[in-house]
């Protein structure tokens, strides 16, 4: 992480994950390939489970919203057991399509999170963090800062990454997690929602990310919204 001085008003630090706490290569070269290589096997093994069916329902709803997009992949409903295999293949194709566009829909992230959970628990995956992340977080905590994670990955996926990391269980060092259910990172309202949720004034929050486009920079010019909450630190 880049060395920097935390502005005086800041009491809370909001951390992005990909490229900030965790190498981008871990997501691109480990997590995403795991989904592509194992999704069909996972669906076949868990198809009858309630959680899996809820994931499919959410993906179907998302597919309906995406029907206007060029090249979208529909997910039909299985009318009979004989059609289950076709439906599973449709889900696989839809997930592949969404991932090819680097989409971050809540439905996709939910299914991915459940797949990663299984892999973390069985030891197939270990969450990666940069070597300076844990020392930095410990130092910030000693200085009295509150620490939260805000990422496009689901809260469950975040907890798995930090709970089963190469540095051990890091969840005790974090005060909470936020994902796209509060809004996307490019939307100013998302940061207001987070501030309201943790009962903290926006000017007391510092958002650290390596991706400038994730920050609604136009807000800097708006006196009604403080710069601190959208400040980024390149890592």
UniProtKB/Swiss-Prot annotation:
InterPro entries, sorted: Enolase-ppase_E1 (IPR023943), ENOPH1_eukaryotes (IPR027511), HAD-like_sf (IPR036412), HAD_sf (IPR023214)
SUPFAM superfamilies per UniProt: HAD-like
Cofactor note: Binds 1 Mg(2+) ion per subunit.
Keywords for this protein: Amino-acid biosynthesis, Cytoplasm, Hydrolase, Magnesium, Metal-binding, Methionine biosynthesis, Nucleus
Enzymatic reactions: 5-methylsulfanyl-2,3-dioxopentyl phosphate + H2O = 1,2-dihydroxy-5-(methylsulfanyl)pent-1-en-3-one + phosphate
Pathway in which the depicted protein is active: Amino-acid biosynthesis; L-methionine biosynthesis via salvage pathway; L-methionine from S-methyl-5-thio-alpha-D-ribose 1-phosphate: step 3/6; Amino-acid biosynthesis; L-methionine biosynthesis via salvage pathway; L-methionine from S-methyl-5-thio-alpha-D-ribose 1-phosphate: step 4/6
Cellular component GO terms, alphabetical: cytoplasm; nucleus
Cofactor(s) this protein requires: Mg(2+)
GO BP terms: L-methionine salvage from methylthioadenosine
Subcellular location(s) of the protein: Cytoplasm; Nucleus
Top-level EC class as recorded in UniProt: hydrolase
Positions contributing to substrate binding: 151-152, 185
PANTHER family to which the protein is assigned, alphabetical: ENOLASE-PHOSPHATASE E1
Subunit field text: Monomer.
Function: Bifunctional enzyme that catalyzes the enolization of 2,3-diketo-5-methylthiopentyl-1-phosphate (DK-MTP-1-P) into the intermediate 2-hydroxy-3-keto-5-methylthiopentenyl-1-phosphate (HK-MTPenyl-1-P), which is then dephosphorylated to form the acireductone 1,2-dihydroxy-3-keto-5-methylthiopentene (DHK-MTPene).
NCBIfam families for the chain: enolase-ppase (TIGR01691)
Membership in a protein family: Belongs to the HAD-like hydrolase superfamily. MasA/MtnC family.
Protein name: Enolase-phosphatase E1
Gene designation per UniProt: enoph1
């Amino acid at each position: 992480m880049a060395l920097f001085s935390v502005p005086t008003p800041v009491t809370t630090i909001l951390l992005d994950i990909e490229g900030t706490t965790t190498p981008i290569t871990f997501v691109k070269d480990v997590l995403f390939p795991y989904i592509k290589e194992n999704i069909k096997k996972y669906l076949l093994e868990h198809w009858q489970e309630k959680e899996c069916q809820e994931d499919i329902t959410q993906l179907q709803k998302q597919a309906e919203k995406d029907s206007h997009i060029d090249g979208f992949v529909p997910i039909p409903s299985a009318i009979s057991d004989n059609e289950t295999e076709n439906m599973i293949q449709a889900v696989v194709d839809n997930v592949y399509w969404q991932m090819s566009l680097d989409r971050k829909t809540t439905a996709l992230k939910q299914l991915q999170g459940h797949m990663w959970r299984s892999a973390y628990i069985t030891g197939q995956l270990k969450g990666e963090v940069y070597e300076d992340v844990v020392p930095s977080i410990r130092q910030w905590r000693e200085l009295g800062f509150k620490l939260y994670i805000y990422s496009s990955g689901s809260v469950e996926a975040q907890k798995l990454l930090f709970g089963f990391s190469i540095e051990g269980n890091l969840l005790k060092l974090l005060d909470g997690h936020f994902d796209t259910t509060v809004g996307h990172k490019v939307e100013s309202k998302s940061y207001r929602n987070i501030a309201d949720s943790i009962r903290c004034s926006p000017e007391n929050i510092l958002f650290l990310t390596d991706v400038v486009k994730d920050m609604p920079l136009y807000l800097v010019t708006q006196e009604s919204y403080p710069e601190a909450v959208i400040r980024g630190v390149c890592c």
